C-alpha cells in the first residue's frame, strides 16, 4: 500500500513539559539547581577518593566510577532539557535523537551491570576477606568495569539500531523531554509489536540479568554473615552492604516503574515528570547514599576540607 502525503522525519520536537508552559521558568531554576548540585556532589566524591590514598581500594574505586557515570548520565539529557525550557523551538535532529538514545542507554545499562559488579565486590569482601586484595586487584577491577561498559555498549547499540531502523513517516512531535525508547517508538510507523519486543529485551538484559547476579551475590553474603559468631560482627558486615542495597532498590525500582508499567496509565506530562526521578534526582542521591553512610569516606572528606582551609 503506497504512502500518501508522508515525509521522512528529519527532526524531533520535544513536547515533554508543553502542558506546564506557565511553570517552565520555575522548572528551569529547579532543574538547574539540581543539576549543579549533582555535578558538585559527584565531583566532590571523585576528588575525595582520588586525593585520599586510604580510599584507594576496590569499593571506592567502583564508587568513583559510579559518580563519574552519574555525571555523564545527566550531561546527556539535562543541559538540552534546560535549553529547551527557555526556548520556543524545542527540537533535536533525527541523528541527534539517535545519539542521545544510544548514550542514555549505554550509560544506563552500564550502570546496571556496574551495580552487579559492586555486589560481587561485597561478596568477595565478606566471603573471602583474606584473599580480597588478590581476587580484587587493580587489573581485575578495571576488567570488571570494562566488562560492564562492554555489556552496556552492546545492549545500547542493538536497541538503538533496532529502533531507528523502523520507518518514521508519522508525526515528529515527541511527548517527552529526551529521546527515551517508548516515546520514540510511538513516532514510528507500525511499531506496536516491535515496541513490545524492544521493551522486553531491555527489561530482560538490563534489569533481570544484573539483578539476578546481585541476588546470587547476596544469597552467599547472607549465608556467610549468619555464620559469624558475634552479633556485632554480623551487624558490621551487613552495614557495608546496606548502601549498595538501597541504591539497587532505587535504581531497579525506578527502571521497573518506568519500563514495566502500562503506558496508558499516565499522561505525557506525568511521564515526563516521572522520568525526572531517574534522570536528575537519582544521579544526585545514589553516590550520596553510598558515601554519607560511610565513616571512612566522611573522615577522608573532613581531612581534605581541613587541609584545604589551612592552605587558604
From Swiss-Prot:
Membrane-spanning intervals of the chain: 26-46, 55-75, 100-120, 140-160, 198-217, 238-258, 272-292
Main location (coarse class): membrane
Positions annotated with a glycan in the UniProt record: 5, 265
CDD domains registered for this protein in UniProt: 7tmA_OR10A-like
GO BP terms in the entry: detection of chemical stimulus involved in sensory perception of smell
Alphabetized InterPro entries for the sequence: GPCR_Rhodpsn, GPCR_Rhodpsn_7TM, Olfact_rcpt
Pfam families recorded: 7tm_4
Cellular localisation: Cell membrane
GO molecular function: G protein-coupled receptor activity; odorant binding; olfactory receptor activity
Intervals, Extracellular compartment: 1-25, 76-99, 161-197, 259-271
SUPFAM superfamilies noted in UniProt: Family A G protein-coupled receptor-like
Chain ranges on the Cytoplasmic side, renumbered to this chain: 47-54, 121-139, 218-237, 293-312
This protein's UniProt keywords: Cell membrane, G-protein coupled receptor, Glycoprotein, Membrane, Olfaction, Receptor, Sensory transduction, Transducer, Transmembrane, Transmembrane helix
Bilayer topology term: Multi-pass membrane protein
One cellular component (GO) term of this entry: membrane
Function: Odorant receptor.
Family: Belongs to the G-protein coupled receptor 1 family.
Name under which the protein is recorded: Olfactory receptor 10K2
Organism: Homo sapiens
Gene: OR10K2
